[in-house]
Design a protein with these regions (language model features):
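Nucleotide-sugar-dependent
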Residues: 14, 233, 284-291, 298-319, ...
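A charged, aromatic-enriched C-terminal amphipathic alpha-helix characteristic of glycosyltransferases
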Residues: 351-355, 367-397
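Nucleotide-activated donor-binding/catalytic signature segment of Leloir-type glycosyltransferases, i.e.
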Residues: 248-250, 256-257, 262-289
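N-terminal subdomain of nucleotide-sugar transferases
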Residues: 1-57, 245
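Carbohydrate-associated surface elements
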Residues: 40, 173, 194
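Membrane-proximal helix-turn-helix segments that form the acceptor-binding/catalytic region
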Residues: 109-112, 116-120, 148-167
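Conserved donor-binding/catalytic core segment of Leloir-type glycosyltransferases
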Residues: 4, 217-233, 238-242, 254
């Protein structure tokens, strides 16, 4: 089967690991011919070009900046991406035909492109639902429901669902939400934020070097948050956790990431002057994976205002590494149901700091701490292996 995969991520090096890298590589491994269309931002010196990576054709498309820019510019530039992708596909892929077109949200602005490609190739269309926009922006009060920008993006969202033959959501709540708020005719299924299994083992010498480099106390438990630091993660709540982290016994907090509020988080840590709190900018993946191996408990944060069920992708690596999960999210995300029902962690709503402190201390003292670790890995093994998820996807498309 010839597969066209459209994404906003930069997938130039498919020898790397990640949600989308592994997704594309597993399709290729199963014998399908995959072409990736991937963004290349202007600020990074992006150029439109067709390359081969790990045996897969990758069409890099130069786009205007959609990261590290203002909210307005990001919105305008996102609307323009469809035009850039259409032009590049016509120029570089005009002699090809595809049986299946797979695309992700974000963005929701590819409806015309997908519709045209679907007609041209008589292809099946599959949406990987990773984001429910524009409702998430309404939840965070970035704009109002009666605004023209909301109406514009909402129309595009509806059209994208309408032209999709199949929709794979990250969790049951994802699928339920779009069905309850839209007319969905597509076949639906759960496709997790899945990855190949990694070996999260760190050699003793590497452990010592990392401990010294970061400046952590090896006698204390490490709570790790890694990922984006922006409005969706509930920055004020994260700062409240930092302010009261001294109430968590014999522990240290390690925050690694980037985003619009990284400097805010970093500044707050400096004001607190708590030697048990470290804030670092984003690390290379191989080094960050070693930090995961070194840590004891993985943290998940989401803003409590969300009415849409987000499902952070950073959970996957933590489960794979067998790390108990302490999650503070909105009540609509079913990440809480997965970690609680599978005995792999604890949850509280992210407007309750007392309960977070209580859960953290409870987890540390629990006789079941080792069981939490074992259950975390078992949840990865059951739900988050890329091989199983690609098999599910291909089975649905074949029927």
């Amino acid at each position: 089967m010839n597969v066209l995969f459209l994404t906003l991520l930069d997938l130039e090096n498919l020898n790397d690991t990640g949600i989308y890298h592994d997704f594309v590589n597993e399709l290729h491994f199963k014998g399908h011919t995959v072409t990736v269309v991937s963004a290349s931002e202007k600020r990074k010196g992006g150029k439109t070009k067709l390359i081969k990576s790990n045996g897969i054709d990758v069409l890099k498309v130069r786009i205007n900046d959609i990261t590290k820019t203002s909210f307005i510019k990001k919105g305008v530039n996102t609307l323009l991406i469809e035009k850039f992708y259409s032009k590049a596909i016509k120029k570089y892929l005009s002699d090809r035909a595809y049986d299946l077109i797979i695309y992700t949200t974000p963005p929701i602005t590819f409806n015309n492109l997908i519709s045209n490609l679907k007609k041209k190739y008589n292809a099946k269309t599959y949406l990987l639902l990773k984001d429910i926009f524009p409702q998430n922006a309404i939840d965070l009060e970035l704009f109002k429901k009666n605004s023209p920008i909301y109406q514009l993006f909402r129309r595009k969202e509806k059209k994208l669902y309408k032209i999709s033959d199949y929709i794979g959501g990250m969790s049951k709540a994802n699928i339920d939400y779009i069905k309850n708020h839209n007319k969905i005719s597509a076949k639906t299924q759960i496709i997790r934020n899945a990855m190949y299994e990694q070996d999260f083992v760190i050699a003793e010498e590497e452990r010592k070097q990392l401990i010294e480099k970061i400046g952590i106390d090896p006698s204390k438990k490490i709570f790790l948050y890694g990922g984006n630091l922006g409005i969706p993660q509930g920055v004020d709540y994260i700062k409240a956790v930092m302010s009261r982290f001294h109430e968590i016994e014999n522990s240290q907090l390690l925050i690694i990431g980037n985003g619009t509020h990284y400097n805010d988080i970093k500044s707050h840590a400096e004001k607190l002057n708590n030697k048990d709190i470290k804030v670092l900018s984003i690390l290379p993946k191989n080094e960050y994976d070693k930090v995961i191996a070194l840590s004891d408990i993985g943290l998940i944060f989401l803003d409590h205002r969300f009415t849409i069920p987000n499902y952070p992708s950073r959970l996957t690596s933590l489960l794979n590494a067998g790390k108990p999960i302490l999650a503070a999210t909105d009540k609509n995300s079913d990440i809480k149901d997965d970690i609680i029902l599978n005995g792999s962690g604890l949850w509280n709503e992210s407007n309750n700091i007392d309960e977070f402190i209580q859960n953290a201390n409870m987890m540390l003292k629990s006789e079941d701490f080792e069981k939490f670790k074992e259950n975390a890995y078992q949840l990865y093994n059951k739900e988050f292996r890329i091989e199983k998820n690609i098999d599910k996807l291909l089975e649905m498309v074949a029927n």
